[in-house]
Amino acid sequence: MGLYLLDYGAGNVQSLANSITKLGHNFKWVTEPEDFHRATSLVFPGVGAFETAISHLETKGLLQPLKEYIQSGKPYFGICIGMQVLFQSSSEGTAKGLGVIPCPIESFDASDKAVPHMGWNSADVVDPSAGAEGVESSSYYYFVHSFRAKYDPDNYPEAMTWSHTTTQYGQELFLSSVRKGSVFGTQFHPEKSGEAGLALIDSWLRKPESEHLHAPSAPVRKLTPKPTHALTKRIIACMDVRANDQGDLVVTKGDQYDVREKTVTADTAGAVRNLGKPVALAAKYYEAGADELCLLNITSFRHSPLQDQPMLAVVRAAAETIFVPLTIGGGIKDSVDPDGTKRPALEVAGAYFRAGADKVSIGSEAVYAVEKLRAAGWEKGDGSSAIETIAHAYGRQAVVVSIDPKRVYVDPKTYAGPYRSELVYGKDDGPEIERNKAWWYQCTVSGGRETRDMSVVELAKGAEILGAGEILVNLIDRDGTGLGFDLDLVNLVKRMVQVPVVASSGAGSAQHFVDVFRETPVEAALAAGIFHREEVKISALKQALQANKINVRD
């Protein structure tokens, strides 16, 4: 008897477990079909692909018991995939859903916006008079998905009686939560929506089970999209994590990727720059209002087996105290344990997801995969790369490709190389090194130490073809300089891909964030050193953005 959580082997379900524990509730995991009979309330969180979810539920003998549980009238709360499986089908694959809601799940229209829909957006209650199930109209909730149930009363009037809230992305309205009888589901992730999300979870869990049984049907009405959606710009705090010379894991920050102190003193000469402990800093940035956190492992732990990796312990500990999205980078590749056990990239990523990560960031391995794709004619990958295997299992929204380019200066009058169409031209009032010059952006691997015969445009487009759901754009020339984001680079990449893009490298002030959001259509911006050194506080940064009429989460 009691509350059960269903995990079919999805991405990060640990964060929901951490949320429930933090809120003071007890639960058990569903481990066998009989647990559905024991459960008096069921929560089904899920991140990943619809087809994979249905397949895994069937393989484990849980699909039919899940359907019977929902039909029994006992309280059910589905999150993301846990909501989508209630529908008839998904254009993501051929598998059929449970058919509880007579409507298909379809992909977003990518012609006027980036897909996946990724970030913090509002949720508008369709019938406020019937209660809001913990959803606050003034709050933002975290979404990350490429497929949605369109709000379509003309073609699916019966399905629309399930609508509890709608959300607008671009000019599309979709069901961001559903409710009827004892069933509740959210497309957004309350466990990743900060205090607003925790309040929603707590509200549902504290409601007496008898009160879950009578949620009314929603009125079917025409809803018109607003001129603009409420999706916010995201501020991401990044922490480069490595072992210092004493063996402790610390957050450091490089100057053009060099993380060792240059000041010559007895204590610091050549030492790894130490800016704090990763778990404590992550908690600090969460409390300060960071929209996402990124932990980049820049130390090799080749002598540790996968399950003993120090970064896994960092992720587990951080996920217990932060309830916003967490990206992990570094080491997401095929590897071999000290005892010779092979660990494919998919298994490595899965370990981080189960520890509490939401996305994985892939760097050098993405370059090698796109080189292979280019050699094969750009059609499609062979399915073996880390990008492809992880995206297939967990959805493309779980895969970030991190690009580390360098500028290559050329004489625009004489350059006739293959990247002429990608050249950026220096401005007369720009830095002296850029005047009368042009340059293209060359990709690197191994932390910027090795250049490859590939441009940033080739890598970004190739990564999207292979299945990346987000592109993180760094620039070695600007890293740690405080000169501001390279707006030309950000605009170049945004023009070439349809997935969300994160600007990185060079932030030195709040104005630099204002500039990148004003001058480019980028979805998010990332910084590290200025936050670590408290040169810019996240709260002050958001105030500056709001003062410039840039929509951000409070």
Give names to the regions the model predicted.
Residues 47-121:
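Cysteine-nucleophile active-site neighborhood
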Residues 286, 290-292, 296-366:
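Active-site beta->alpha loop and helix N-cap motifs at the rims of alpha/beta catalytic domains
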Residues 88-168:
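Pocket-forming structural segment of enzyme catalytic cores
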Residues 45-51, 79-83, 296-298, 326-336, ...:
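Glycine-rich beta-strand-to-loop/alpha-helix junction loops that act as flexible
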Residues 370-380, 387-390, 514-554:
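C-terminal helical cap(s) of enzyme catalytic domains, especially alpha/beta-barrels
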Residues 218-322, 378-382, 389, 393-401, ...:
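Conserved N-terminal beta1-alpha1 strand-loop-helix module at the mouth
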Residues 182-225:
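Acyltransferase
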Residues 322-359, 409, 488-525:
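Catalytic cores of alpha/beta
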